[in-house]
């Protein structure tokens, strides 16, 4: 080899040694340019509040009662149960985990608290206390009858929200999961458990757990047996399993389908096909279309015993669209666009009016952001700023939430949780969580040991292109500002390759703890770290933490007939879908 060739080889070797450093400094520029995803201050404030809410012990058993910050008041009679606060509070946590995939310990901790509470007496309160027909069904007020009761069944029909456990043909069923009905309990439980697994990276609920039943009984399940049971029920009932006895809610089934979607993505199964078959089978019965194919009405609930669809105008479809977006984006967007047009939200010359409560608008705002509908999003966002009463509260103003001018001590749980959906992530984030979940994060460098909420994490992101972990920390703990603390980074390919910058300067105050982990000194302050780890995710995620068994579901090409009875209600008085007027 000539001297020139030797020089060329030496230069190439030299540049190879410089490449990681060049990538590292280039990555700092990318960090400052805003490419790295980040949680905003409101999201961190809400996260801090959820952390306090979930980690404060309370008693959801037969002998206790949830603390008053758990929402048991919103949207009676159908949603005024504490378990709906558990489910609604989980959604934004999944989005947060995708913004900071390298830091998940607090999300997992909160979701564990939500899951544990969902197994209790108070989570299944309606199923465990509402036996037989509603003794007050002869005394419903007129506005209640107009909204909820089929015209030909007045005086002999139970209102939505009354589960009627024990009526024929099902009889008394003590197990809230094993029951033929109670879909809204088991469907949302699986969804929350999936989000917990998605943040923790372990098959936690694959181990047996106990769920509270009638008369202090307990029933043993795993998440996998729950999903198998739910899927079997759905296959056997093409209209969908019911929530209250006799009532099938497409709203609840869409949420249950979302849980199956994420379950399949994590565990590599095929249970979600029942959702698509259900949509196609029931579309002609549950939705009303005019001769040109335009949407005229959408379902509230369906009673297969009397073949009755209880329906509202197109605007009601927003409640279904929110859950359907990751599963059937085309039909979901059709429901959304029709609803926003009917409501006039896309008309800049028309004011936004919706009352007496704001849950519906929070769902619309989340959908607008998801679809990238900038006109509707900006209009609803402005309305929310004026009417949702967003504010900071608690010690050092550490917590954030929406109070909705209700003059209550805490943010109204269900509504406030939905309102936070528009604060987290970018366009398409809700769909991406379920359609393209980030599972490789479990093998990537991971931040832990953060003294949350006194020290908060706004960014924790592994950039595969430059092998760098970006971390942004902040603190609102006035009593600890600038005091020393430490954090840990695990799942490192080789700790000996580590190079660290703190706020742009080389940083050496760190040490190797064990084979694949380092400990890093920091302070309670606003700090940015760029940590070159060399991780590039060159190999596909192995799913080593999860089962890979597959199940199949036979196809169903049937289509349902029109219902014998349809009641189209004026939902202007509806506490669940307020003042839609269409």
Regions from the PLM with identified roles:
Residues 40-51, 90, 104-122, 145, ...:
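Hydrophobic core segments within long, regular secondary-structure runs in both alpha-
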Residues 8-74, 81-83, 90, 95, ...:
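Terminal, non-catalytic domain-edge segments
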Residues 214-225, 236-359:
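Extended ligand-binding clefts on enzyme/binding-domain cores
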Residues 558-562, 566-582:
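C-terminal outer-membrane/trafficking sorting elements
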Residues 101-247, 254, 293-296:
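Extended ligand-binding groove/face enriched in aromatic
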Residues 119-142, 232-242, 283-310, 346-355, ...:
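Charged/polar, low-hydrophobicity segments characteristic of intrinsically disordered regions
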